[in-house]
Swiss-Prot record:
Coiled coil: none annotated. It comes from Sphingobium indicum (strain DSM 16413 / CCM 7287 / MTCC 6362 / UT26 / NBRC 101211 / UT26S). This is Ribonuclease D. It comes from the Bacteria. It is an enzyme of class 3 (hydrolase). Its cofactor is a divalent metal cation. The lineage of its organism: Bacteria, Pseudomonadati, Pseudomonadota, Alphaproteobacteria, Sphingomonadales.
């Protein structure tokens, strides 16, 4: 495989993209920094096909990334291969308003092949290629220039091994009849709505004990305000106001801006500064949370009650058994919210009642809930037995 020098000019990038656009699939990875910012700071993009690989420097002055981004989001003829690509997809979405398609995520594929729920890239490379990666450069400050050869080689290794692993995984998925199992997951992670930062939904990420409509309404207004402040200033949310402080203000709202000086987690300057004024305006604009927006009393167990919670526990035990028996990560088979919904009596719009998930788990899950299936221990091994 030909490894190119770091690409820093538009002509070289356009030529590279034109060549790899003829490949049926490419491997993609990014390096970024976001410890001190709201938006991830893209520092490096690595791309490889079966014949060549390169790292692209998006910070190079005058570099036009359009050929690369067009290849990612507009070329449907090239499959894009990522490993644990959620943050890579977020970055591409932020730049283009689109997500790569079609795509393949090797971490999700590994779940279907019994390699655990969140296998790291190093372990994946070791498992499939028998190569132990040098991890010496993983804590690099990717925003700092210049990058040395060791750092660039480390970054390119993320795609040169990935491009070798993909066809092996694909062959194994086909051999085991599990290739189609991943289609729904790949469509799910490529859905652009996953990467939209909607201020009006930000409150759902803040932990708060209260379930009162007026308190949650204040939290919704405050979290939306904080989200917009963080986006505008490009600062982490916690640098604006920490979650616990936001929840405290929603639960015990100050009457005046001067009262902000008494709030734990805010400095005395909030009594008089502009950001304190904006917080108070957001607080004044709130409305009680609408009934349809109200969270369940226990968000982990929606409307289950004690018996329903026990049924959900039994379903999760069944899930462990099926995961063990078919050697597929439990997380790929069923999500906790689907299991809780099934335990609560829901029978529609559940992924576990469709396709391969129904065949491998959902049918037995319904039978367990409806009394046609029970647990049994035979020769020290937990199994399922039919009751009728």
């Amino acid at each position: 495989m030909q490894i190119h020098p770091l690409i820093t000019d538009s002509k070289t990038l356009a030529q590279f993209c034109a060549r790899i656009a003829k490949s049926p699939y490419i491997a993609v990875d990014t390096e970024f920094m976001r410890e001190n910012s709201y938006w991830p700071d893209l520092c490096l993009v690595q791309v490889a096909d079966e014949h060549e690989a390169a790292a692209i420097d998006p910070k190079a002055p005058g570099l036009d990334l359009s050929p690369l981004l067009d290849l990612m989001v507009d070329n449907e003829d090239v499959l894009k291969v990522f490993h644990a690509g959620g943050q890579d997809l977020e970055i591409i979405y932020n730049l283009t308003g689109k997500t790569p398609h079609p795509l393949f995520d090797t971490q999700i594929a590994a779940m279907a092949l019994g390699l655990g729920e969140q296998i790291g890239y190093g372990n994946l490379v070791d498992a499939w290629l028998g190569v132990q990666l040098d991890k010496g450069a993983r804590f690099t400050d990717w925003a700092r220039r210049p990058l040395d050869k060791r750092q660039i080689d480390y970054a390119i290794g993320d795609v040169t091994y990935l491009i070798q692993i993909f066809p092996k995984m694909l062959e194994e998925l086909r051999r085991t009849g599990r290739g189609d199992w991943l289609d729904q997951e790949m469509e799910r992670i490529s859905d652009p709505s996953n990467y939209e930062n909607k201020p009006e939904e930000a409150w759902q990420r803040v932990r708060i004990a209260s379930r009162k409509a007026d308190v949650l309404g204040r939290l919704k207004a405050l979290a939306a305000w904080r989200e917009m402040e963080a986006q505008d200033k490009n600062l982490p949310r916690g640098r604006i106001v920490k979650d616990e402080t936001l929840a405290d203000i929603a639960s015990h709202p100050p009457r005046t801006q001067e009262d902000l000086g008494k709030v734990r987690g805010l400095s005395a300057t909030w009594k008089t500064n502009d950001i304190g004024n904006r917080l108070m305006l957001a607080l004044a604009s709130h409305a009680p949370l609408a009934k349809e927006e109200m969270p369940e009393r226990d968000p982990k167990r929606p409307g289950l009650g004690k018996d329903g919670a026990l049924v959900a526990d039994l379903l999760k035990l069944l899930l462990k058994i099926r995961s063990r028996d078919i050697n597929v990560a439990a997380r790929l088979i069923a999500r906790s919210d689907d299991i809780d919904a099934l335990a609560a009596g829901v029978r529609e719009d559940l992924a576990i009642l469709e396709g391969w998930r129904y065949e491998q788990f959902g049918r037995d899950a319904v039978d367990l809930v409806e009394g046609r299936l029970a647990f049994a221990v035979k020769n020290g091994r937990l199994k399922m037995t039919r009751t009728q």
